Design a protein with these regions (language model features):
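Nucleotide 5′-phosphate-binding alpha/beta core
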Residues: 1-109, 116-131, 135-148, 155, ...
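Residue-level signal for inorganic ion chemistry
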Residues: 53, 110, 149, 207, ...
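Phosphate- and divalent-cation-binding pockets in alpha/beta enzyme and binding domains
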Residues: 59, 63, 216-217, 237-241, ...
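AMP-binding/adenylate-forming
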Residues: 128, 150-212
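Short, hinge-like loop/turn segments at secondary-structure boundaries
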Residues: 168, 268-272, 430
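Adenylate-forming
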Residues: 185-192, 200, 204-239, 252-257
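AMP-binding/adenylate-forming catalytic core of the ANL superfamily
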Residues: 207, 305-409
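Conserved AMP-binding/adenylate-forming
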Residues: 225, 234, 238-325, 340-341
């Protein structure tokens, strides 16, 4: 299946859009009405992926020996080495499927937020589980036929449009990523009113997208439906802030360009439930062993979507607290802690993760900051770049300084008018130069 061609027709052909939506709804309802089938589906897809990798990937052929069956696939997956970006770069074609030709046209790129972008071939087979899982989430959120979806992402808007105060573009299709895409790249005090005016004209039932962009828009609106947060780490406090502003529930979604995990988070808490329909999720320690319930580890995934480069026991670089497994086969992530690299080092050399330190600290001061970014170039010293919100004051600054000083840091604050986003329109909260 070539997703590029599907996206093309979804954008230009209303009949294809209608058929695709009906197809996704059919399977979404089927899975939602029969959750007892999820674990068996997962086992069948895991068996199929391992068998495919054995037949088509030189790299896996040396590790997967003998027939792969449903009664031994779990044993096989646990015996395989972990896969990371360095292995993929060094092995390249050995890890790729032998169905990938020299002139293969469909390639994907990860965002490279860790400084390690990945370029890999895209090949899809069978049921489009990405669309099915997206539809299951929308139906859980109350989606009705005809509801309008919009997104906040990093799309690039033409200079001509921006000169006319247009900071959005039409999407490929309403489902799943929105009929209208608002760019987070151009949000500021001058442009925010045009975003809000267009939102009011569009009247979406669902807003999905980067938490930092949606948060920034709310804060800017304060200065001068249903929300689904995707693609960035965020906290319960941020969900509550957005929920109170829009007066609607806020759901979380966790996934990657590598199409190997699809997890959802309900409005009331921070727990993620990883879909067994989409992939097989583990949480492992530094030795690659699965952690116990309540312990911290790295999220490792095996996806059922991507065959061009089978992501089998792939290290995501994300840390989480393992919460066990539901009776339906969903892996529980009690708390997503962010990326392994999202940490700073105090004067004693202690590694401190941002999620627990800042996001989990319920610091009131951050309600009075439009956006911010940390830079660390030496142990124990942090520079913080801040775009002030209107209510920012000396007391807010004191609270921030006190937080860092009490935890063993020297803090230098720079006040700026703008903080550059990534190419994809995401907000990087940390530039870490220490290795």
């Amino acid at each position: 299946m070539n997703r590029t061609y599907l996206q093309k027709y979804l954008k230009t052909n209303s009949s294809i859009q209608w058929l695709y939506m009906k197809y996704m709804q059919y399977y979404a309802k089927k899975f939602l009405n029969h959750p007892e089938t999820w674990k068996q589906w997962q086992l069948a897809k895991l068996t199929a992926m391992l068998s495919y990798a054995q037949r088509h990937c030189t790299y896996y052929r040396k590790y997967i020996v003998g027939e792969v069956r449903m009664d031994n696939s779990m044993e096989i997956i646990k015996s395989l080495p972990l896969l990371d970006k360095n292995i993929i770069r060094h092995q390249e074609k050995n890890v790729y499927s032998d169905e990938i030709t020299d002139n293969w046209k469909v390639w994907l790129n990860t965002g490279g937020s860790t400084g390690e972008p990945l370029h890999f071939p895209a090949l899809y087979k069978g049921l489009p589980v990405e669309g099915v899982c997206q539809m299951m989430l929308y139906m859980k959120m109350g989606y009705q036929w005809g509801d309008i979806i919009v997104s906040f992402d990093g799309c690039r808007i033409k200079d001509e449009d921006r000169s006319r105060n247009i900071y959005w573009q039409m999407g490929n299709a309403n489902f799943p990523f929105g009929k209208k895409n608002f760019s987070t790249l151009y949000l500021d005090n001058n442009s925010v009113k045009y975003y809000w005016e267009e939102l009011k004209r569009t009247k979406p039932a669902f807003i999905r997208g980067y938490p930092s962009g949606i948060m920034e828009m709310c804060k800017l609106a304060m200065n001068t439906g249903i929300v689904n947060l995707t693609s960035e780490s965020f906290t319960q406090d941020e969900k509550n802030f957005i929920s109170s502003y829009f007066k609607c529930p806020v759901y979380g979604q966790y996934g990657h360009t590598e199409s190997s995990i699809f997890a959802i988070q309900n409005p009331a808490d921070e727990v993620y439930y990883c879909s067994p329909i989409y992939g097989y999720t583990e949480v492992v320690d530094q030795k690659g062993q699965h952690v116990n319930i309540g312990e911290q580890g790295e999220v490792v995934v095996t996806g059922f979507v991507e065959y061009g480069l089978p992501f089998i026991r792939y290290k995501t670089g994300d840390l989480a607290i393992y919460g066990g497994e539901t009776e339906l086969g969903e892996t529980i992530l009690t708390k997503l802690l962010g990326r392994e690299v999202d940490c700073i080092y105090n004067k004693g050399g202690k590694k401190i993760y941002l999620v627990g330190f800042i996001f989990g600290g319920h610091i009131r001061a951050f309600n009075y900051i439009q956006t911010w970014q940390l830079h660390q170039y030496e142990v124990g010293k942090v520079e913080m770049y801040i775009v002030k919100a209107r209510e920012y004051s000396d007391n807010v600054e004191k609270e921030i300084v006190n937080l860092f000083v009490c935890n063993g840091f020297e803090l230098i604050i720079h006040y700026v008018d703008f903080i550059e986003k990534t190419n994809r329109g995401k907000q990087r909260f940390l530039i870490q130069e220490l290795k």
